[in-house]
Amino acid sequence: MNNYDDLPCSIYFKKPTVQEFVDQPRVFEDSEVPAFQEVLQLPQERTKPPVPSTQPIVAAVEVAKKKSCLSAPKPRKEPPSHPALRQKTVAFGKTVNVSQTVEGTSRNSKKVLASTMSAQNTTTTEEQAAENWRDAMKTELQTIRTEIQEETARRQEELNAQNLVKMQELMSNFFQKITIPKQQAIEPVEKDKENFHESPRQSRQQKPASKIASAREVIKRDGVIPPEALTIIEQRLRSDPMFRQQIDNVLADAECDANRAAYSPPPPMSEVRYGSGVNPALMRETLTVERSIRYDNGLASIDSRQWTNERRDNRAPDSYRTYEPDQPCHSLYQKGQSISYYPSEAAGKTTARNNRTGYYVEDSSDHEEDVVVNKRGQNYHEQAVPETPAERERRIREKYARRK
């Protein structure tokens, strides 16, 4: 509230209007570029014409400007151009000259700085000149070195070319000296004459070469070694142990293949043919040759099969025994001459055995290998002498009479 409103006065004063000021950017005095602040001028207040009233006018008061804190400030002075005359605001609002700050620009400091800079400039100039001289010398030396290398390479190439030409000349002369002129082709008539007058010694020397060539052709074509090649191979066997060992290896491989083929086990027999599932060798049954079993790809009886199995069983544990191939099993079956018999093992007699004829025989002598057949000794591995029908019938009757 304005205090002027309450005063009793015959002069009317207009209430002051508040002027709004636009915020201006703050200008620092230490900046290089001078900043000028626009000062807003307040318009002059005009005196309001007096209102006619009945009150008497006591006095005339001249309208004057009212000073207020909101009035525009005085225009700032332009900062001096000389840096020494400028002012700088330091901490706590204290304003001092630039010469009094740490960045001082006094004459002494300027002189010291100028002398130091001159000395540094002089030293830098000398070092730069020395560096430039060294660079120039290095460049010059590098150029000279490159020229020398190019000259040396060119001279070496010329020398190599000269040496190559000389070597070619020497080689051509050498080949001309050692070259033998080609002989003319001999006509067939003259060749026959030369062969006619050839000495027998030369002919003997040429014949073995032709025989060897023919032997080689025979070996390549037919795979047969001719007698001429056998003689040479025998001589090589006696003189060359490596060749002898190679031949021995070939023969050993062949022997191993033969033994493996002979010792190969027979195919397993099928048990399907036995309906009852019982081993036929243990059955008490009268068999005939017509009902015998095929064994080892041949017709054989049960006794023959059992005898062969026993021999194989006895040989199995003897691993150090040399290989002895089994004798082939031959059947003595003749059509229309079948005879019934009992197997000896099935009968339970260990002292009796069957001979190779397939008949039951009892050993009556001490000699195990001889069997009395037809009143004469005969090895039991040999084939039996054919009997007459009468002798066979009589022998069968005697056999069954003894068994009863």
From Swiss-Prot:
<feature type="coiled-coil region">
    <location>
        <begin position="134"/>
        <end position="170"/>
    </location>
</feature>
<feature type="compositionally biased region" description="Basic and acidic residues">
    <location>
        <begin position="308"/>
        <end position="324"/>
    </location>
</feature>
<feature type="region of interest" description="Disordered">
    <location>
        <begin position="306"/>
        <end position="325"/>
    </location>
</feature>
<dbReference type="GO" id="GO:0007099">
    <property type="term" value="P:centriole replication"/>
</dbReference>
<dbReference type="GO" id="GO:0005737">
    <property type="term" value="C:cytoplasm"/>
</dbReference>
<keyword id="KW-0175">Coiled coil</keyword>
<feature type="region of interest" description="Disordered">
    <location>
        <begin position="192"/>
        <end position="214"/>
    </location>
</feature>
<dbReference type="GO" id="GO:0098534">
    <property type="term" value="P:centriole assembly"/>
</dbReference>
<keyword id="KW-0217">Developmental protein</keyword>
<dbReference type="GO" id="GO:0005814">
    <property type="term" value="C:centriole"/>
</dbReference>
<dbReference type="Pfam" id="PF21518">
    <property type="entry name" value="Sas-5-like_implico"/>
</dbReference>
<keyword id="KW-0131">Cell cycle</keyword>
<protein>
    <recommendedName>
        <fullName>Spindle assembly abnormal protein 5</fullName>
    </recommendedName>
</protein>
<comment type="subunit">
    <text>Interacts with sas-6 via its coiled coil domain. Interacts (via C terminus) with let-92 (part of the PP2A complex).</text>
</comment>
<keyword id="KW-0206">Cytoskeleton</keyword>
<dbReference type="GO" id="GO:0051298">
    <property type="term" value="P:centrosome duplication"/>
</dbReference>
<feature type="region of interest" description="Disordered">
    <location>
        <begin position="376"/>
        <end position="404"/>
    </location>
</feature>
<feature type="compositionally biased region" description="Basic and acidic residues">
    <location>
        <begin position="192"/>
        <end position="201"/>
    </location>
</feature>
<comment type="function">
    <text>Required for centrosome duplication. Essential for daughter-centriole formation. Requires both maternal and partenal expression, suggesting that it regulates centriole duplication during both spermatogenesis and early embryogenesis.</text>
</comment>
<feature type="compositionally biased region" description="Basic and acidic residues">
    <location>
        <begin position="389"/>
        <end position="404"/>
    </location>
</feature>
<keyword id="KW-0963">Cytoplasm</keyword>
<dbReference type="InterPro" id="IPR048594">
    <property type="entry name" value="Sas-5-like_implico"/>
</dbReference>
